């Protein structure tokens, strides 16, 4: 990875989206459809954290399947570029995020990785909305569930 990889990756995403993107105090915000994303530089060296709020809070009575799937997403942190999910204890917001460094931060490949993450965040938003409206993956085998070869390319994620 060369110095300035995070800037080059953001520039490549800017070209792909056709939007002017730039870091402001090490962060950048971008809207994709109706979903806001934050992209920020993190830690020593070039590393980007991409995040999106996918729900204001958990559904009141989440299904066991949803809870299991959200817990399984914690393993994304063990692999560069795979998404994970966290809940902000102060606001209750549920956020999806992924950390990109090294080979996952190469400028020509970052826009594809970002698009995969954006698709994942949208699927997770839809899944949480479905649970909140009473449609549970437990009740019929998979509200919004993706297969192991899902179109977003996250082969260990089952959301």
Question: Model segments located where?
Answer:
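Charge-rich, low-complexity N-terminal segments
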Residues: 1-38, 78, 86
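Short, internal acidic amphipathic alpha-helical interface segments
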Residues: 53-97
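A mid-sequence interfacial segment
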Residues: 84-116
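A contiguous, mid-protein "functional segment" used to position or interact
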Residues: 104-137
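Short, highly charged C-terminal tails/helix-capping segments
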Residues: 129-159
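A short acidic-to-branched-hydrophobic micro-motif
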Residues: 41, 45-56
